[in-house]
Amino acid sequence: MKKIIWISSYPKSGNTWIRYFLSNYFFNKKKEESSFGILNKIDKFPPNKYLENIVDKKFLEKNPFNISKYWEKVQSEIVKSDNEYIFLKNHNALLTIEGNDFTNEIYSLGAIYLVRDPRDVVVSYSNFLRNLDINQTINRVTNKNLICHISKKNSLDIEILGSWKLNYISWRDGVKKIPKIIIRYEDLIYNTFETKLKIINFLSKLLYCKVDIDQLNFSISQSDFNRLKNIENIHGFHKNENNFFNSGKTKQWTQILSKEQIAIIENEFKEEMLELGYINL
């Protein structure tokens, strides 16, 4: 039985960017010029095609957290796939909801967790959502209650996020038997080759395959942020009216957030930001 490799993160932390990189590395061996269609090689969890035949929509409408009752069932079907590799994009926290584990070592081979400075997450997330201003986005990112995010385009696309902190800690500490690697968004920008090589080394050990440096370099060039932004400007991103690849920069928060807003984020996430090198004592 094959197992799942998770590409997990809090929203706006580089998940789709890495998904594009990995899609080219593992599924574009002919080294053809790629566009956003290649992202279809890596589904977002939970994939609609597995849910639509087993879900009671009224059951979910009554309580979106009931999506947790389908997590294991969907994963048990996904691992039957004929695909050589099974990667899944995910924003869910690694939690147990009403007795339902998000995942376990039976279905999961490993996980890449992408983390980004929460001050920049707030800026990027607010820009992406559009209907929330900075203060409202800070409230969402710091909210200690579990939050269900339901896609406007697909009522079955339900994610249980938690706060930025809870999401990060859940993947850092949860299900010890699942091998994990934590990757900072900032390292993808400033140490691109070394960081992406680190990811491929991690995956190569899980998948028992050799590192292909030529394929790595090709995949890095294909997933160059400016290249993806240009493609989006010309063709759009899956008909998404919001810009998905906005700026890709770090420390945008220094120009946008007020001192009060910065203080709220840093006070709420002090321990984790220290751990990740985002603030100093």
Description of each model-found segment:
Residues 1-183, 247-251, 260-281:
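PAPS-dependent sulfotransferase catalytic domain
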Residues 29-52, 87, 176-255, 259, ...:
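The conserved 3'-phosphoadenosine-5'-phosphosulfate
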